[in-house]
Amino acid sequence: VEPENRNISLAFQENSLFPHYTVEKNILLGADRNKDKKDKNVNFQEIIDLLDISLILNKFPHEISAGEAQRASLARSLITNPDLLLLDEPLSNVDQSFKEEIQEKLKKILKSSKITTIIVTHDSYEAFYLGSKCGIILNQELKQFDDPYNVYHLPNSIEVVNFLNRGILIPAEVTSPKSLENKDLGTITGNFNKPFPIGSKVKLLVQPEDLHHDDQSNLKFEVIDRKFRGTNFIYTLKTPSNLLIPVFVHSHHIHQHEENEKFGIKRPIHIDHIVCF
């Protein structure tokens, strides 16, 4: 198939607007290419409203910000009504406060228009939200391809765990088909992602949401760091064997702990998805 007949659009990470055209003219380049396609319903005003760029249509690229230029590039790729849309870090220069709104609207417009889209991003949250499937590529190799839920909760390798950087791998011993033991946390129950012989020495993945705060618990560890993330805190706890374990707590929780305080972990510990390596 000749390039001009492939009906593929691409939005680059860098500003790819023509400097001698206004934003509007940049967006409308190629807009008539697929005007006869009846099964697509993306229109100019819908895209302008989606990306909130009506006030910059008559400006030139050197007169707008990097985030505005990136939104204009994204608009240009959408206006062609492609069968396949390729997006390279499409929202990397967009302010976080506006980014989530664009993601929500973009997801709706891609779904309603039935545009197949491949997005390259280093933002795992963006990939999980926008993608029906996620591929983790490391060192030019596809390590895992699955739906977002499984990529997060059931990573298939230590490499994927390290890439997502959401939890910690701790040493443990399998004590039954549904339990294992860790020196600091004690007994942990749940459903294994794959069977291990009893007595196996494994590395257990502990995600921030796997452990629960309980001030009344006798299992307490020292808080060495606390990160405020708006709706939640991520505490880093230090165990007697010097493990650094992340724990998620809602920010509206009645009592927040400071560094060097003791933080209680609720018992018994149950993890729905026990992932071991």
Where do the language-model regions lie?
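Nucleotide-sugar-dependent glycosyltransferase donor-binding/catalytic pocket residues
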Residues: 17, 153, 228
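ABC ATPase nucleotide-binding domains
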Residues: 7-9, 22-159
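Catalytic "switch" loops of ABC-type ATPases
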Residues: 13-18, 123
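Non-catalytic connector elements of ABC transporters
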Residues: 167, 178-277
